[in-house]
Amino acid sequence: MFARLPVVFLYAFVAFGALVAALPGGHPGTTTPPVTTTVTVTTPPSTTTIAAGGTCTTGSLSCCNQVQSASSSPVTALLGLLGIVLSDLNVLVGISCSPLTVIGVGGSGCSAQTVCCENTQFNGLINIGCTPINIL
């Protein structure tokens, strides 16, 4: 009876080794590449109309630190980093914008460029389809 005990331990050792090799948590043979998400924004030609008193009728009134063409180098770099693809590069893009209310439209409401924008992305970091306006 005791002569078979080493054989039983040998089988148990081999079975345990096979079980450990089959368990997850080891080093995988292949890695999965990260998933890339692309956001495509299509903006029609600017149709924003400005009513008397500096209010937008088709977008939101914003105060932007910079307003540049979507084809400019800084804007294309920022759009690329954020994964935004524009179908039309002939639109104006507002950078680092904050919304303006009717109360904030007065003289000291915006010390940069006041614009009316159709699309706001990333909480005002990028506003797409902007039209500069002058508030009197």
Swiss-Prot record:
Cysteines engaged in disulfide bonds, as pairs: C56-C63, C64-C97, C110-C116, C117-C130
Record-level Gene Ontology MF annotations: structural constituent of cell wall
Major localization listed first in the record, in broad terms: secreted
Annotated SMART domains: HYDRO (SM00075)
Observed effect of gene inactivation: Leads to a wettable phenotype with hydrophilic aerial hyphae. Reduces the surface tension, therefore decreasing the formation of aerial hyphae and primordia. Affects the composition of the cell wall with an increase of the amount of mucilage (i.e., water-soluble (1-3)beta-glucan with single glucose residues attached by (1-6)beta-linkages), and a decrease of the amount of alkali-resistant glucan (linked to chitin).
Stretch forming the signal peptide: 1-24
Induction: Expression is regulated by the mating-type genes in the secondary mycelium, and especially repressed by the MATB-controlled pathway.
Pfam families listed in its UniProt record: Hydrophobin (PF01185)
One Gene Ontology CC term in the entry: extracellular region
Keywords annotated in UniProt: Cell wall, Disulfide bond, Fruiting body, Secreted, Signal
Alphabetical list of InterPro entries matching this protein: Hydrophobin, Hydrophobin_CS
Subcellular location: Secreted; Secreted, Cell wall
Cross-referenced PROSITE patterns: HYDROPHOBIN
Post-translational modification, as annotated: The protein contains 20 mannose residues.
Application notes: Thin and stable coatings of SC3 hydrophobin onto polymeric substrates have potential utility of hydrophobin coatings for personal care or biomedical applications requiring lubricious, low-friction surfaces. SC3 has also potential anti-tumor activity with cytotoxic activity towards melanoma cells at a high SC3 concentration but no direct effect towards sarcoma cells.
Protein task: Aerial growth, conidiation, and dispersal of filamentous fungi in the environment rely upon a capability of their secreting small amphipathic proteins called hydrophobins (HPBs) with low sequence identity. Class I can self-assemble into an outermost layer of rodlet bundles on aerial cell surfaces, conferring cellular hydrophobicity that supports fungal growth, development and dispersal; whereas Class II form highly ordered films at water-air interfaces through intermolecular interactions but contribute nothing to the rodlet structure.
Family: Belongs to the fungal hydrophobin family.
Quaternary data: Self-assembles to form functional amyloid fibrils called rodlets. Self-assembly into fibrillar rodlets occurs spontaneously at hydrophobic:hydrophilic interfaces and the rodlets further associate laterally to form amphipathic monolayers. Schizophyllan stabilizes small hydrophobin multimers in aqueous solutionand is necessary for subsequent hydrophobin assembly into films on hydrophilic surfaces.
Protein name, as recorded: Class I hydrophobin SC3
Naturally occurring in which organism (per UniProt): Schizophyllum commune
